[in-house]
């Protein structure tokens, strides 16, 4: 956005500054454990939620699908928020959903307790394509047992969550925010578990 490239091509946004990098959000792809979907290739012909319209999740999902060769003709997509997507998956109304968020995401954990789930890993080819296409993507491993019933680690990509502030904010206000972030770092880490 700052340089007007990528998704912001031609739309330079320079009225803000980064205050701090917060945490890494994992691109999580959730399916029912009783499904026949074990890899991204298995999503062909399936009905999936790629996140709310114009969200970071939607952007990540589209880029992951493109890197896998799954065009909009090969998958049927919906723009559900996480709660809608989890409900739709639980009710067999969709086959998978994307969720870009910190791990231990509450909506995924609640779903896992209600209906067994599986998270899909990205293969090495997909990971390399994504990381070559954008410096914002990093290799990320979701540890085994992050969610109920998830007994294997999951290989995916992550994106850094960054706190931005308008350049109109006073330096004093930015200093107060920054100080609060670092003085309450442990509290914030604990609260992220419940996202």
Predicted regions and their residues:
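Short amphipathic alpha-helical coupling segments at ligand-binding clamshell hinges
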Residues: 170-180
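Pocket-lining segment of extracytoplasmic ligand-binding domains
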Residues: 4-7, 35, 72-164, 168-169
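Conserved small/polar residues in nucleotide/adenosyl-binding loops
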Residues: 193-195
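Second-shell loop/turn segments in exported
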Residues: 16, 47-53, 162-168
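A C-terminal functional module that forms or caps the active site or interfaces directly
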Residues: 178-185, 189
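Acidic, polar ligand-binding/catalytic clefts
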Residues: 1-23, 102-106
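Bilobed "Venus flytrap"/periplasmic-binding protein-like clamshell domains
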Residues: 21-91
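Extracellular/periplasmic catalytic domains that process cell-envelope and extracellular macromolecules
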Residues: 10-12, 21-23, 42, 112, ...
